[in-house]
Amino acid sequence: MALANEIMGSRLIFERSSSLASPFHSRFSIKKKTQRTQFSINPFDPRPMRAVNSSGVVAAISEDLVKTLRISTVGRKQEKEEEEEKSVKFKVRAVATVRNKNKEDFKETLVKHLDAFTDKIGRNVVLELMSTQVDPKTNEPKKSKAAVLKDWSKKSNSKAERVHYTAEFTVDSAFGSPGAITVTNKHQKEFFLESITIEGFACGPVHFPCNSWVQSQKDHPSKRILFTNQPYLPSETPSGLRTLREKELENLRGNGKGERKLSDRIYDYDVYNDIGNPDISRELARPTLGGREFPYPRRCRTGRSSTDTDMMSERRVEKPLPMYVPRDEQFEESKQNTFAACRLKAVLHNLIPSLKASILAEDFANFGEIDSLYKEGLLLKLGFQDDMFKKFPLPKIVTTLQKSSEGLLRYDTPKIVSKDKYAWLRDDEFARQAIAGINPVNIERVTSYPPVSNLDPEIYGPGLHSALTEDHIIGQLDGLTVQQALETNRLFMVDYHDIYLPFLDRINALDGRKAYATRTILFLTRLGTLKPIAIELSLPSQSSSNQKSKRVVTPPVDATSNWMWQLAKAHVGSNDAGVHQLVNHWLRTHACLEPFILAAHRQLSAMHPIFKLLDPHMRYTLEINAVARQTLISADGVIESCFTAGQYGLEISSAAYKNKWRFDMEGLPADLIRRGMAVPDPTQPHGLKLLVEDYPYANDGLLLWSAIQTWVRTYVERYYANSNLIQTDTELQAWYSESINVGHADHRDAEWWPKLSTVEDLVSVITTIIWLASAQHAALNFGQYPYGGYVPNRPPLMRRLIPDESDPEFTSFIEDPQKYFFSSMPSLLQTTKFMAVVDTLSTHSPDEEYIGERQQPSIWTGDAEIVDAFYGFSAEIGRIEKEIDKRNRDPSRRNRCGAGVLPYELMAPSSEPGVTCRGVPNSVSI
């Protein structure tokens, strides 16, 4: 009977409690809380209903095993069950799915053919199956005999994207359930192993969702360890997998020494000491970010040697050479192709402006010249006539490029001017973008008027008080007094005073850079829309400028004040663009997530249920952050070249991390409450009452936040029946502790870090991380070209201050205000460079995974009930998308529907590839 029970599945792969108190009607019996949740049933699941088999799983038994049983029954009736069990051997079959590259270079093709040849003579891919049980004789996991993948040589020329290889293992009846598999690649070339499925065990197919590069044994001699899709908490790890679990984590941690190879899979920490390049020029030296002077999150360690001129700076790797990230974090082929196409587009877009800038004036003359970037193509825009081509040989090359790739040299029309060419000029549109644009996370309710600075007057002087008075705004309050407007929650503000003022002297000393520290006061009208009623422009009190340190600009009353107002709004837009890019986008959704990702790979086994939950939300983030260090935030990179703050941009980012960033305030509800945009209200659907009811970012964001939170709670409660399980989960606690104490070491002593002691604590922490990686990043990223591609709407930098009557430039401003306006804006080359970059950053790649989607959705976990719950989560995301579409057609929602008004789709979950101004990917992948 022992043998029969083993065969018929009484001991399943999933070695947990046999309690049947599950709300999911699962085929498996797994200990959990007996609580029904929103996602327990999925009405939209297209898969056929499963039959519930309460008596156990019907085994898939191989023919060899059946024959052996028949012989054993007839010929060995007198033997003991133990001896019978030892004598039974049977075969199981492995199917390995390998993903091919679509394009190979000559070297890769040559090595592939060499591997095909050597595979015939024994240099194979070797697999070894590991049991969940320990062999009592060796005190090590039970193992199968080694097996090789068959027909590698025959299939080497296959053009299919996925190629399936098979292998056969011989195991005996005492083997137990498979829990891991080792892979040894004796070829010269790495390969991408997508999955392995084992068939022939009593429990049915066993899945290994690998999605990993397997390196050649010559580069990495140790065997690759891959686990089944069955999740285990550390305390529940089967005895046969415990050593393997810890060994794999040790492999991923490394020893913190040496320079990393591109084929490595090691996750470790370092400071941002590779932004500058002091070996080339002293002007390219930059301070290290991370430490007491410039606090910052940690990034992935590469181990490169120090520069010659600064032992504390790491030697840079410049394009086209790749930066190190662990091999499985690198972009897959389709993502690489999308990036390469965008780089080509950027090069072509900037080639002609670079040529023109050397021979013609660098400023735009009028709005028509900007418009022609989208309508006529760059050559027509630049006015290269036949006689000019004759004089300059280089433009002949450009002509060829123009004829052969005309589409690449013409910019797409940004959405902000696609419906209404002049919408960006209107005050209501300027204000609307504070709640429905690309940076809707800085607006806050005014609680006292005039606003008060939090800067230290002993450091920044006594002139920190605001120049705003009641007289500046009283005529714009629909008959209310200022106090009444405050009490009825009608006054709001976008305040960049404190974040910019400490840096203005250095910024304004840069060539071609001029900035104020701005405050914009907004009034909530009876229609639920906002209007700007005053803009305060501040300079340091000891500024070298001849201008007053503070001035207030109010809505225009004549032609002169109209141009003053437009220039003031442009300076606000420049402040906003800098904070958006350097703080809200890069710092809060890119850099601050990297430590959590590094710690997850170092401390959470691939078998850990929380790792499986987080996995899709970590995809590509380390790679895109490495690319950012190489080209975007580097010395003289895109950010320094295109934004007002120039080389001081990352210092502003560091100051924001030091003074403003708090993980406990990064979740949407907490952030809305902190900014005074909402108050707790248990009667509302999300427990919050928005003080601006038509706040598209918050309205749609709360839908996604709630769905993510419910999904996370469903998942967490599945594995943690009580708080003690969380407190004693060694891997989970190590992950959170390392994220704080190492990854965010400069904030390690902060009292605001949430505890990780209860189920609710874990739900909150994981929900916040997933929110930041998905919806928050999408809201801040994918509208960059649709809103910022028309540079006058939100110029990334300004080159001139606003003149007043005492300024010598005031006369030229009065004589030709349009010329002064464009001379204040970015130059032609700065504009086209910025447009090319934000076009790339706003692009969805074809392999994007969106919220509610997963690779291998039915086998990413071996917990069938969680698979069902995930399908329920996906269905909820689909309902949210329909609700967002409905809201965008509702004329009562004036901040997202109306003549010339862009619909708010940045949190609409799905998208086609390209620049769409919608779509919520699972992770920070661009």
From Swiss-Prot:
Residues in PLAT domain copies: 106-228
Q: Where does Fe cation bind?
A: H585, H590, H777, N781, I926
**Catalytic activity reported:** (9Z,12Z)-octadecadienoate + O2 = (13S)-hydroperoxy-(9Z,11E)-octadecadienoate; (9Z,12Z,15Z)-octadecatrienoate + O2 = (13S)-hydroperoxy-(9Z,11E,15Z)-octadecatrienoate
Q: Which GO terms describe its molecular function?
A: linoleate 13S-lipoxygenase activity; metal ion binding
Q: Name one GO cellular component term.
A: chloroplast
Q: Which cofactor does it need?
A: Fe cation
Residue interval of the organelle targeting sequence: 1-58
Q: What is its main location?
A: plastid
Q: How would you classify this enzyme at the top EC level?
A: oxidoreductase
Q: Which residues cross the membrane?
A: none
Q: In which tissues is it expressed?
A: Expressed in leaves.
Q: Which UniProt keywords apply?
A: Chloroplast, Dioxygenase, Fatty acid biosynthesis, Fatty acid metabolism, Iron, Lipid biosynthesis, Lipid metabolism, Metal-binding, Oxidoreductase, Oxylipin biosynthesis, Plastid, Transit peptide
Q: Which SMART domains match?
A: LH2 (SM00308)
What does the record's cofactor remark say about binding? Binds 1 Fe cation per subunit.
Question: What biological-process GO terms show up in the record?
Answer: anther dehiscence; anther development; fatty acid biosynthetic process; lipid oxidation; oxylipin biosynthetic process; pollen development; response to bacterium; response to ozone
Q: Which SUPFAM superfamilies match?
A: Lipase/lipooxygenase domain (PLAT/LH2 domain) (SSF49723), Lipoxigenase (SSF48484)
Where in or outside the cell is it found?
Plastid, Chloroplast
Please state which protein family the record places this protein in.
Answer: Belongs to the lipoxygenase family.
- Provide the function of this protein: Plant lipoxygenases may be involved in a number of diverse aspects of plant physiology including growth and development, pest resistance, and senescence or responses to wounding. Catalyzes the hydroperoxidation of lipids containing a cis,cis-1,4-pentadiene structure. 13S-lipoxygenase that can use linolenic acid as substrates.
Q: What PANTHER family does the database record attribute to this sequence? A: LIPOXYGENASE
- Tell me the protein's name: Lipoxygenase 4, chloroplastic
* Species, as recorded: Arabidopsis thaliana
